[in-house]
């Protein structure tokens, strides 16, 4: 009868402390991701309408918060399905348009001429950073609450089987066409035309008119709507987790039935989280969507891949789960902070996941927790 990932982990490990720590991690990681999406959506709107960035952040805040409060989970799932299909088509269209604009394979020569390291297989720093982003976002798909909530909402086993095939295929196709775009964009975008990587897609669709003025404008709107859809998904997950697993959590199970008062409190948290993320997105120094997304994904990977994925199949212990989540969080935040101050070039996802997995496996072998039951695994 679990309604949130933190709720499930608390039940799975029979620990209220596990539930609360998991809820804190979900809330913090969600805010990081919300900030990144707010910035991305606002930049796209600013590029399309030629409005100040702050005005666009405010517009996104008002629109997405309003329809999240009005529609709830069902509206989020329906809009996500449509926007996901549009994004899949759009990703392929952008990749083909960029390939054509760069004269096919000649685009790699242009990239190499600009900077030989960009096309070098020995540029380990760049390769490590690229793989880190792919890993952080990839493992996030396995354990992120807003993704798992979609499977919670499937109506039967048949729908679950279909989703288990369609979802990985869609991810592979999207990754395959979008990940190379950053490097390919260097051959098309003139030096000094943009200030940060956050502006790559708005520039390609706007100033460069990669898909033409009409189609480019339409797809830019698709990107904005997809970003807004991501915002409402994260808002619902984070708000329900804070309300249910932090504010209302007790040593006994919380009733699965929601009263009107419960709904009102969750809505209040939706507003608070949305406003907080939007305000932080306005801070001048917060200007790297990739960095924030990778940071958020690294936290999920270091903390939840061991305790949620591995914990379904091997011996479980609340102490092990707590130690893993806390250590994983400290490792990711610590390495991320050191890199911001130039003390290391290491990507936080690598030590975070490595330490989290090794610690969980070692402590699981030494703990006296019970083995997972067949019912646990089926859940």
Where do the PLM segments sit?
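Membrane-embedded helix-loop-helix hairpins and adjacent transmembrane boundary segments
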Residues: 1-379
